[in-house]
Amino acid sequence: MKIVISPAKKMQTDGGFLPKSQPVFLDQAEELWSYLHSLDQAGLEKVWRANAKITEEARQMLAADLTQPQVPALFAYSGLQYQYLAADVLDQAGLDYLDQHLRVLSGLYGSLRPFDGIVPYRLEMKSPLPAFKYKSLYEFWGEKVYQELYQDDSVVLNLASKEYSHLLTPFLKEGDRLLEVVFQEEKNGKWRTQATHAKMARGRLVRWLAEGGRDLSDLPGFTDFGYAFAPDQSGEDRVVFRKKA
């Protein structure tokens, strides 16, 4: 089983751990890095969908050398999901579990193992790519990420957003399973996903799996934040957790 999660916009360079490996798709990342270097201010503003001030600040990231990474991927992202995953306080068994099972989907790096060394960057899957030979990052990556994830596993637990899981969905073949995890809350008689709470729950679920060395059969036992497994809403490719608001 593999577990996929989205990256986070917020990143840091001091995670307290050293990288153990290079990203599988480092060559492709360097191609994208070179493309970003080739753009002028206006081009970067389009790619990053940012104003001049934010673009100038983000542009400083491009001075980094991808072959001299600063921090492992698992500790480079500091968004809400990663805060609740809290990998920095997992024991070695938990970290080993994540190293084996967890992958971070990335616009720049494609797919990252937890201890792949990376640098801070700004590049989302839906970023426009002016003056590039590919129309989109989806076209650039094609089947590469799918093939890497499914070469040894037929089951992937999907905790990523649709923006990132679309790196996989168009290429699924018979026998492949992409098991989506959904967190819902009841409000005004309707069940909806509350984005902030879902990010927290995704991070906590990854941690819960790692702490117990758990697999798919254990998923119904997750009850953090008051969520409970909803068997009537779940199915072959969907696991739903619900709670009363």
UniProtKB/Swiss-Prot annotation:
Pfam families per record = H2O2_YaaD (PF03883)
InterPro entries in alphabetical order: YaaA
Q: Which HAMAP family match?
A: UPF0246
Question: Family per UniProt?
Answer: Belongs to the UPF0246 family.
- What domain of life? Bacteria
Query: What do the Gene Ontology cellular component annotations say?
Result: cytosol
Q: Name one GO biological process term.
A: response to hydroperoxide
- Name assigned to this protein: UPF0246 protein Ldb2075
**Database matches in NCBIfam families:** PRK02101.1-4
